[in-house]
Amino acid sequence: MKAGCSIVEKPEGGGGYQFPDWAYKTESSPGSRQIQLWHFILELLQKEEFRHVIAWQQGEYGEFVIKDPDEVARLWGRRKCKPQMNYDKLSRALRYYYNKRILHKTKGKRFTYKFNFNKLVMPNYPFINIRSSGVVPQSAPPVPTASSRFHFPPLDTHSPTNDVQPGRFSASSLTASGQESSNGTDRKTELSELEDGSAADWRRGVDPMSSRNAIGGGGIGHQKRKPDIMLPLFARPGMYPDPHSPFAVSPIPGRGGVLNVPISPALSLTPTIFSYSPSPGLSPFTSSSCFSFNPEEMKHYLHSQACSVFNYHLSPRTFPRYPGLMVPPLQCQMHPEESTQFSIKLQPPPVGRKNRERVESSEESAPVTTPTMASIPPRIKVEPASEKDPESLRQSAREKEEHTQEEGTVPSRTIEEEKGTIFARPAAPPIWPSVPISTPSEEPLEVTEDIEDRPGKEPSAPEKKEDALMPPKLRLKRRWNDDPEARELSKSGKFLWNGSGPQGLATAAADA
């Protein structure tokens, strides 16, 4: 804590309230050892000197009333070294606990709250031992586990054959048994076994019938009775002089074995073996009653994390480690072998925009060029721009421009000349049908020239497919290297017949 800050000291004698080292929020504020508000309220409720400030509500289980809210806020501010603390801030902190299900506001009563002990802390109420003989576990894990913040020393139950007497739970006998438990060396070894979480402790044979005799032997009327299966598992010794306190004398003797490791009040209040309702506290770290940083347990936890996707209903996170509870084997171990049977086939990447246009244009030009090989005159007369759809004309023109832009070997002067020849041409669409009629002598010559050149230029169907799949730059380079005549024609300005005949013609028509 900060220097010069007055702190409420924990009394050494009877009536004191002992916290383990790990009951403070060390993980969120290292070194400050801050106590949580609900711990502080329980601490005030345990002390006689604060009865005028805060007290248990009579006749209600776990309900308390704040008689002097300003004084409680002042005490809390002094404990936290915050002199500006008031009840508004404190009540906001209490409202935070509503969602955590630690406590809730009692409707219709001012400054009255109720702890959810029956749900939150454990199935049977945690009878807090207020004697100063309780031993604080020094080897507690640094994170909050599925265990209570308080330590409950077990009573002497080494001889399970002894019948439990009804008068055993008088105050004097309880005090005597508490002194025995603090003085006996064999009890200390048992405590150390519990703190270490040894596996032998879980398998210790306890006669369940003796604990049921204890249930029938002594009982208190106002105590809420739990089902028999819960009571033997979560029995706690303890006493408290106030008859209205929930920390009343337990009707069950504490057994030195099963589940004397406490259960966390801040997490899910009931262990998952009794309730399968999902809650934030159902993490694999907190589902077990006894946590240790064991590499085997860590491996088990990581394995359950990996398998939880495949079979969540069989995952170890839903089962705490209790003796005699059979968890079915995990099924996700079969998945690596199954996955090897199926080979993964990757699809080729989708064709880019340029390649897709080239494939479409080659498919368009293919049906047009095949009839030209068969009969020459229809090829020229079918070509007029009025019949050709403007979409394909625009597409081929765009393709031509991309050709010229991608070509790195052609100097910029030639590109400008080519663009000039294309855009300077004043021919309008009506002129094109008259071209074959006006120049009948020149046309057949050019057509035959084109047909002679075509076997070299125009590849067969499989070669066309290869061309379509080839990168555009490589295809352009290959065409450029294969056609010296086309190069010369384009340089001299006759750009129309640089590509395939009809395509070039259509391009010029579109650009005009």
From Swiss-Prot:
Principal subcellular localisation of the protein: nucleus
Ranges where the record places region Disordered: 136-222, 336-512
Skewed-composition ranges (Polar residues): 158-184
Composition skew (Acidic residues), residue ranges: 443-452
MF GO annotations: DEAD/H-box RNA helicase binding; DNA-binding transcription factor activity, RNA polymerase II-specific; DNA-binding transcription repressor activity, RNA polymerase II-specific; RNA polymerase II transcription regulatory region sequence-specific DNA binding
Entry-linked SMART domains: ETS (SM00413)
Residues modified to N6-acetyllysine: 388
Cellular component, GO annotation: chromatin; nucleoplasm; nucleus; RNA polymerase II transcription repressor complex
Record function comment: Transcriptional repressor that contribute to growth arrest during terminal macrophage differentiation by repressing target genes involved in Ras-dependent proliferation. Represses MMP1 promoter activity.
Name this polypeptide is given: ETS translocation variant 3
Organism, scientific name: Pan troglodytes
